[in-house]
Amino acid sequence: MPLLNTITTPYAEAFLQVAESKKEVEKIIAQAKSILQLWDESSELREAMGSPVLEVESKKAALEKIFSGKVTPSFLNFMKLLAERQRIGFLNSVLERLLELYRAQRNIALATVTSATPLNEDQQAALLKNVQSVAGTNNLELNLKVDPDLIGGFVVRVGSKVIDASLSGQVRRMGLELAKVT
């Protein structure tokens, strides 16, 4: 996605610099994660912000109404700037890039854990400890997802490493082995 990075990186870098200058980095990062979740869950928001029919001022007013008091003023201004520059449709990509830059700056590895059922705190703690050894760092961020199609177990992704300890993965591997035999 080099083209997308040429759009998202300058905005993400600039916003990270603003957050650092205002000493709001941790707050901005937490808000970015929340907004990304909202963006993923709300097709109406994505469609409205990405719509070429909706006027820029209407988009800015909608952002103000939705996010005022829920995000820092600098975050709201950032989103309005994206709307003004016809880039609000890329909000998720810009925020993803922001998180990547933040993690890179602080040497934080991202581990995506997909489980068949939600993990309780004890399971998360145990998994975090094991994933830290696989990742080779204690500075780790867990991104938890649930996918009932896994049937049981979990799949962990850290960079290019994948650990598939899911029941569906075991069934798939067993099927491949059986196919080799026949």
Swiss-Prot record:
Membrane topology (UniProt): Peripheral membrane protein
Keywords: ATP synthesis, CF(1), Hydrogen ion transport, Ion transport, Membrane, Thylakoid, Transport
PROSITE patterns in UniProt: ATPASE_DELTA
Localisation: Cellular thylakoid membrane
GO cellular component, one term: plasma membrane-derived thylakoid membrane
Subunit text: F-type ATPases have 2 components, F(1) - the catalytic core - and F(0) - the membrane proton channel. F(1) has five subunits: alpha(3), beta(3), gamma(1), delta(1), epsilon(1). CF(0) has four main subunits: a(1), b(1), b'(1) and c(10-14). The alpha and beta chains form an alternating ring which encloses part of the gamma chain. F(1) is attached to F(0) by a central stalk formed by the gamma and epsilon chains, while a peripheral stalk is formed by the delta, b and b' chains.
Protein name: ATP synthase subunit delta
Species of provenance: Prochlorococcus marinus (strain MIT 9211)
Designated gene of the protein: atpH
